[in-house]
């Protein structure tokens, strides 16, 4: 799942999505 979020945040084409998933991704990676 982390890869999925990273892939969507890499192009930063969707800042809204990236920002919305950023916290979830951060928690997933840190947890």
From Swiss-Prot:
Transmembrane region(s): none
Example of a GO MF term: serine-type endopeptidase inhibitor activity
BPTI/Kunitz inhibitor domain location: 1-31
Keyword Translocase: no
Keywords: Disulfide bond, Protease inhibitor, Serine protease inhibitor
Site (Reactive bond): 19-20
Coiled-coil intervals: none
This protein's record includes keyword tRNA processing: no
Job of this protein: Serine protease inhibitor. Inhibits trypsin, elastase, plasmin and kallikrein.
The protein's name: Kunitz-type serine protease inhibitor RsTIQ2
Organism for this UniProt entry: Rhipicephalus sanguineus (Brown dog tick)
Taxonomy of the source species: Eukaryota, Metazoa, Ecdysozoa, Arthropoda, Chelicerata
